[in-house]
Amino acid sequence: MGSKVKVGIVGGAGYTGGETLRLLVNHPQVEIAFVQSRSQAGKNVSDLHRDLLGDCDLTFSDTHQHDADVVFLCLGHGESKVFLAGANIPLSTKIIDLSQDFRLSEPSGERDFVYGLPELQREKIKQADNIANPGCFATTIELGLLPLASKGILGEVHTTGITGSTGAGQKLQETSHFSWRTNNVSAYKTLTHQHLKEINQTLKSLQPNFIGSIYFVPWRGAFSRGIYVSSVVKSPLLLDEAYDLFTSFYQNAAFTHVSETMIDLKQVVNTNKCLVHLEKVGDHLIIHTATDNLLKGASGQAVQNMNLMFGLDETAGLKLKANIH
């Protein structure tokens, strides 16, 4: 693509809005047309996102513009549908929605949304006009299970996952307050997490007979960003066979990598990577996956999807390095 992609961000004051902006400021083929935030309208973007001082001279607008090629919706769950219903954005403008509003296959008005998990449907994303960006836990769990579902051998899943405080959003809550979160661990939404519907839908797209038995216990961690998931399934595969399956499935994936050594969270934080490690104990296969919830779990994957939609290098603006010390 010759000219730069003109992008807009709606909901630019929150965590995902700020993270999307940080990526786009450094993207070689992007021009930022506007950053909208009703709560911060008229203020300098760098006054709120202070790490962008010297890198971004934009101000927050209170409205969106109509001349963008693509708009990132970084709004709260339930707000994207309301925004699109009243915004009169031209259908020629592509939409990448980071909320959960359009992830499930159900009627969504004038726009049809494609589920934006590149490892699952890269070619569909390339042709899409509207993307429903996957959830952070959904991304991390799905990337550990897709290879098994692709062979129709995925059975009952028991999974636990721990997430950083940014997964709860920027609005202060009791369970994201530093004095509560630090030196503390707690479970929440046991077996009822909202991403389960999304995960089941995705797995059934590869394995229609999957019965949807996923027993998921999410945990709050005493750190700011990152997700670490361990999923346990019964499997007849030997460990070498499992590694062959996962390595083959992800051989063309730009950001998902299979590691034969144990992974940890620091390897992925501040990157768009998902790392996968496998273990076999008896007849149980254990799949460990790790991502940064704000990047591969949100803004990084959104930019990855934008790159695919506009025929750009899939890794443009996303060649990020973890700080492991």
Q: Where in the sequence are the language-model features?
A:
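Short Gly/Pro-enriched turn/cap motifs at secondary-structure boundaries
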Residues: 187-191, 219-220, 264-268
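C-terminal substrate-binding/catalytic lobe of Rossmann-fold NAD(P)-dependent dehydrogenases
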Residues: 192-258
